[in-house]
Design a protein with these regions (language model features):
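Glycan-recognition and catalytic cores of secretory/periplasmic carbohydrate-active enzymes
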Residues: 1-393
């Protein structure tokens, strides 16, 4: 496994993070550019997204925590300062969805998903450095979500609200999503940062929130017939249950496992481990013989999106390494290694750096989508590298 760990460190440092340090830093307006397209062209006047910047903060903070390189601390601090100075809403709390290239608020809605990633980034910076300001911001954002986005009547977290925390008509994260008032994706990316915050801020109120989120996954989001996670719901937790998202399933399997491990409750862990193994088995329906994982299955019409998106492969690898580490299932190790070989051959851009967005169904590289942008950040792939470096498997 040492060879695999060495490979991960090399890819992390010389393919992923080096790209963001040399290509994406915005020296004129601060922070990082909002977009580098699939042909490596920088778009210096592109809007800057909260999710992208929070994920940059997380990635460099985590890299510094593990590797202790000063250039990673410098980049993490750059991201922290930018999110603090330009995305934090000092008047109403929470963070803006986007700012323009000069840092002026552009879309001021409060998307719970984005606030979750800000907690993830600030809590990781605090974990890596002990910085009190970063921890205080993460705690404040946690309280913003609990005060405004948590629905105590129906349980669960509301997808989006206006800047002033009032109801909003269009709650979608992106044009591809259904307009549901609560989604699996947002709940996944709330439990993930809450778990990380718990590592540095162990309080009963946060533990209660996390345990409730686990219950939401097992009681509301999990499809008891298929063991896939259903994606979109209304206030009463009614949904079409018509999409199977393999990448989200395998990502949830290891993130929910991580949460149970961090809470350190043996009875809870036993319950969650039985469930996450079933979720991972369901996710494996998306595997192909080369170890790669396809994107989605729409049960209406039985159609598949056969793209091999970069982030799905990252979560596929972590999820199967997690299963091998804790349950010693050799086939899961082989799946992870096969998927990594696919990534190394097809998705890594060894000439220009970073990873391509996807390999299309016809086998061609997807260059229509970004190398760096609103939804393309050094998060899934740097986390995959760091997970494989840090874990004992």
């Amino acid at each position: 496994m040492e060879n695999l760990k060495e490979t991960m460190r090399d890819v992390l440092e010389n393919n992923i993070l080096s790209y963001w340090l040399t290509k994406v830093k915005d020296e004129e307006n601060g922070g990082f550019y909002g977009r580098v397209d699939g042909n490596d062209q920088v778009h210096p006047e592109a809007e800057k997204g909260a999710v992208m910047n929070a994920r940059i903060l997380w990635a460099f903070s985590a890299a510094y925590r593990v590797l202790k390189k000063p250039e990673y601390l410098e980049a993490a601090t750059r991201a922290k300062d930018y999110v603090r100075d330009y995305f934090l809403d000092r008047e109403y709390g929470g963070i803006y969805w986007s700012v323009d290239y000069q840092g002026n608020p552009l879309d001021t809605k409060k998307q719970t998903y984005a606030i979750g990633f800000a907690i993830y980034g600030f809590s990781e910076y605090a974990r890596a450095t002990g910085d009190k300001e970063a921890l205080d911001i993460a705690i404040s954002l946690y309280h913003d979500i609990e005060k405004h986005a948590f629905d105590a009547e129906n349980n669960g977290y509301i997808e989006a609200l206006t800047r002033e925390w009032n109801p909003i008509a269009d709650m979608r994260l992106s044009d591809k999503d259904e307009n549901g008032s609560r989604t699996m994706n947002t709940h996944l990316h709330i439990i993930e940062p809450y778990t990380n915050l718990y590592r540095v801020w162990k309080t009963l109120e946060l533990e209660k929130s996390i345990r409730n989120l686990l219950d939401i996954f097992t009681d509301k989001l999990l499809n008891k017939e298929t063991y896939h996670l259903d994606l979109f719901f209304n206030d009463e937790w009614e949904g079409k249950r018509n999409i199977e998202s393999y990448g989200h399933d395998i990502e949830a399997s290891w993130l929910l496992h991580e949460t149970a491990l961090v809470l350190d409750d043996k009875i809870l862990l036993h319950k969650i481990e039985r469930i996450i193994r079933r979720i991972a088995d369901a996710a494996d329906e998306g595997l192909r013989p080369d170890g790669s994982m396809v994107y989605e299955h729409w049960k209406d019409g039985d159609k598949y999106d056969l793209q091999r998106q970069w982030w799905v492969q990252c979560e596929n690898i972590i999820g199967h390494i997690d299963l091998y580490q804790y349950f010693r299932t050799e086939e899961h190790l082989q799946t992870a290694i096969a998927c990594w070989n696919y990534v190394a051959k097809h998705l890594l851009d060894n000439k220009n750096g970073e990873w391509h967005w996807a390999i299309l169904e016809n086998g061609m590289v997807n260059k229509e989508d970004d190398k760096a942008g609103f939804w393309k950040c050094p998060y899934h792939n740097s986390r995959m590298c760091l997970e494989l470096i840090e874990r004992d498997y």
